Amino acid sequence: ISFEGSRTSDNDFFRATYDASVTGFNGQDILVADTDLKENECREIVIRYQLDSLDGNCQLIYISPDLEEQVLFESASGSVAVQLQAGANYIGITGIDFSGTIQITVE
């Protein structure tokens, strides 16, 4: 895998940025996580994304406290809102032989 770009992550505030050109991405990469979110910290986050694929597949996923995986997007660009829940919350990407550019902002 080749990764060229930048990424930031702030688990305390559940924010992240990912701006990279990748080649041969296989597997999963967690962008931001909070393993013990309290009920009063649960809020809606907005994820903006742009995905330009040269080859393979890439998905943005949300993993909820009950470890249910939800695909938020697989291609193109746009934004999606996610309601965080008490417990463990994860936002990540999964790739299958993915090559292309990925831009993601979680706020």
PLM regions with names:
Residues R43-S53, I93:
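A short beta-strand element within beta-rich, extracytoplasmic domains
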Residues L54-L72, I104:
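Short, surface-exposed beta-strand/strand-loop-strand elements in extracellular ectodomains
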Residues L31-I45, A81-A86:
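Extracellular and analogous surface-interaction loops
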Residues N89-I91:
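A short tyrosine-centered beta-strand micro-motif
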Residues F73-S79:
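Short, solvent-exposed loop/turn segments in extracellular or other extracytoplasmic domains
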Residues I1-D36:
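Transition segment at domain starts
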Residues C58, G95-E107:
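Edge beta-strands of jelly-roll/beta-sandwich modules across compartments, strongly enriched
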Residues Q59-I61, Q83, T94:
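Extracytosolic and intramembrane catalytic regions of membrane-associated proteins
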